[in-house]
Amino acid sequence: MRYLQNKKNNLPANNTEEIISHPLETDIEANQAKLEALLEHCSDAVFREFVIGKQPPIRCLLLYFDGLVQRKMLDDNIIKSLLLDVQMTDNPKSEFEQGDLLTAVEQNIINVAELKRIATLQEVIRHISSGDTVLLIDGCSQALVAGTRGWESRSINTPENELVIYGPKEGFIENLRSNTALIRRRLKSSNFKIESMVIGKITQTDVVLCYIDNIAPPQLVDEVRKRLQMIDIDAVLDSNYIQELIMEHKSTIFSQAEQTEKPDRAAAHLVFP
């Protein structure tokens, strides 16, 4: 398993709107390259590569967003079934015609209540952004979508300092991945980027930089990223440490940054900066 990190690929970064309209191909490598281009700088995107069968092995790819899925359902009903049940068949392509391989997996292997097929990259992005898991199989021009939605709900606190009468009552908690999932649920776009980094020599605190690729000014994103990477400090115990260190004019009476406990407000600021 690997999380998609900041990496180079063979597809132009500014061509995502054109890429997302493409249908899925039978070549799993081509599909993966396009999805990695669309999800570049999305550190919560998980690409799980594996093979099924033995003679010959068939390449597969699971794709989901960490924090949006029920991990137990994913592990027990999808990954375990694919890695154990299918491996007992030496040659799945001979047992099922290649065109029916997806049907065989759909009907006999994956054990979830919600399961359907999709055929475009745009559908892949939309479903994983909603908490579903997508399975791509080499040689198949369609993908399977498994309903694995299962994010934090009632354990997420009501904001104490930003009380509202109307609208969502959810507030951020101390778990970073749960917090990014709260924003990801509201911004179901491949242009919403989450870049991960670690700050603090002793605390090794996980920090994420969130922005919408075609809305946030690139020079602003680059400057914030640069200032975060230049922070040299022993401990980061709360967000005030970060805010103080990246501000340009520390003595000004004018606000240079806002803090919020509400994911809907954070999402709104990303969409309408």
Q: Which positions does each model-derived feature cover?
A:
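Membrane-embedded alpha-helical signal segments
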Residues: 1-273
